[in-house]
Amino acid sequence: MDTSDKEYLKKEGYPLMKGAAQFCKAWLVSDKNDNLITSPATSPENQYKLENGFEGATLYGGTADLAMIRECFDKTIKASKVLNIDADFRAQLERDIARLHPYQIGKKGNLQEWYFDWDDKDTKHRHQSHLFGLFPGNHITPSKTPELALACKNTLEMKGDETTGLSKGWRINLWARLWDGNRAYKMFRELLRYVDPDGKKTEKPRRGGGTYPNLFDAHPPFQIDGNFGGTAAIVEMLVQSNENEIRLLPALPDAWDSGTIKGIYARGGFELELYWNNKRLDKLIISSKLGGKSTLIYGNQTKVIQLKKGEIQDILW
């Protein structure tokens, strides 16, 4: 859908998406409120702790499961519409997505990870799988779901920044999606913190993430997720197109007060060049590989563009 390659979507993408959606549908059951939940469920590698001291990992209605299912159903529905096929199955997904157990905000203002408002056994646990809807998912955003976005922010604040490379790479992207460029940049710098492979000259323990001299993300032995996550985060700090619009410099850190980026792609087949000075966007050069319409957002400014295939526009701000 992001490239408008309908042939690929029809032959490869949609069958895979539909199969995943069918699997998820078979996994769902109704709770006492007639909401759909997963059962059994876990939240990857994390555990909860009850007031009576009981610790567990298995439950039902885990937030991470439901976040991924929301994203899967939403994308499958959209793909079905693009291809104009499977209207009956699409209708089933539309009914089911409306019945999914809703997100819950806990007593501490955090996004609940569990079906109930339970505490984590480890309050600083490296995983934040229940924030999937914010990133890499697209259905939680500061503009469209501000209360949920704030709950995600509170969750990240509670967990802190010190974590493994995999998790640090993910959290940089989460902060970028929350439009907090300085926090994202802080963690990006920590991701690049030197780690001695022999553990003799390391500033902080390996569990805190960092980078080996060969630029591999430190864990040990190696977490490529940290490398990929850090790279993705640079893009997310400068351009976001996860809400159908193209948002320019949404999480620009103070440290990058002036700069240029070329060859960055946005959903819909748009290629961008951005030029900024003193933390202000000066110029955008945008071209369309497919032809189409989009909305550009920079701060409080909005511009609607319509480009033909191969057309290039220079836009001054």
Predicted regions and their residues:
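Secondary-structure transition/capping motifs at alpha-helix termini
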Residues: 1-11, 23-35, 143-144, 178-185, ...
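C-terminal substrate/ligand-recognition segments
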Residues: 1, 121-200, 220-236
